[in-house]
Amino acid sequence: MALTQSLKLSNGVMMPVLGFGMWKLQDGNEAETATMWAIKSGYRHIDTAAIYKNEESAGRAIASCGVPREELFVTTKLWNSDQGYESTLSAFEKSIKKLGLEYVDLYLIHWPGKDKFIDTWKAFEKLYADKKVRAIGVSNFHEHHIEELLKHCKVAPMVNQIELHPLLNQKALCEYCKSKNIAVTAWSPLGQGHLVEDARLKAIGGKYGKTAAQVMLRWEIQAGVITIPKSGNEARIKENGNIFDFELTAEDIQVIDGMNAGHRYGPDPEVFMNDF
């Protein structure tokens, strides 16, 4: 069964709320096989990036999976060193060639960077106008980055992909994005695996016959957040997709919300944005 529950972006494009994240999947057999498992398990949203160096693997899986292209939602991202107007256009062409696609569904600026994201966004707007991408967005942008972008853009970002999990619930940023009609996607939605044995999450899962991982993904989706768990394990990929047959209660959500500690497993965009 296709996992097609979707969220409508500000431009009307439908984006599946569950995606398959490809971070850290080795290019070649590992990434291609895992992506194929995900698609066969019903995933219709694939999330890769230039820096992951596995766009070609994603492309091979997409080409051979038997699912029509228009039924898949493919995201890739521009790396920091390619920011700037002309270099963005060039980098996009490299990505789309590696993917073997005529268009991507969502293209993201991976990190804010130092001082080029305005010019970079103008290139994104051109790609969008030229229908090479169906939606454009950002990743790891804080409120002040988005405010700066909104001062200069013709087309507002449709998505902001950020680190988000129970120890970093990003409530304020999520509320801000919602106020600007920007959808939020969670990367590292399971806290890079550190939270799958958490007793609080396991106790909640026990009520539904679900794992802590499934509870976290369900919590994100019920909060209106798109989530992209990564795994190279076929059983885990299937498990992560099996989250649409139960619903967390308000009390469950209160417990998970209460776990927030402002703890990042990934870099802080305020620091990493200068690291090219």
Curated annotation (Swiss-Prot):
Protein name: 9,11-endoperoxide prostaglandin H2 reductase
InterPro entries: AKR (IPR020471), AKR5A (IPR044499), Aldo/ket_reductase_CS (IPR018170), NADP_OxRdtase_dom (IPR023210), NADP_OxRdtase_dom_sf (IPR036812)
Record function comment: Catalyzes the NADP-dependent formation of prostaglandin F2-alpha from prostaglandin H2. Also has aldo/ketoreductase activity towards the synthetic substrates 9,10-phenanthrenequinone and p-nitrobenzaldehyde.
Record keywords: Cytoplasm, Fatty acid biosynthesis, Fatty acid metabolism, Lipid biosynthesis, Lipid metabolism, NADP, Nucleotide-binding, Oxidoreductase, Prostaglandin biosynthesis, Prostaglandin metabolism
Residue numbers marked as site, Lowers pKa of active site Tyr: K77
Family (UniProt): Belongs to the aldo/keto reductase family.
Activity dependence on pH, as recorded: Optimum pH is 6-9.
Catalytic activity: prostaglandin F2alpha + NADP(+) = prostaglandin H2 + NADPH + H(+)
UniProt-annotated location(s): Cytoplasm
Residues where NADP(+) binds: 22-23, 47, 139-140, 161, 187-192, 230-232, 236-240
Superkingdom, taxonomy of origin: Eukaryota
GO biological process: D-arabinose catabolic process; prostaglandin biosynthetic process
Gene Ontology CC annotations of this record: cytoplasm
Species for this entry: Trypanosoma brucei brucei
Database matches in Pfam families: Aldo_ket_red (PF00248)
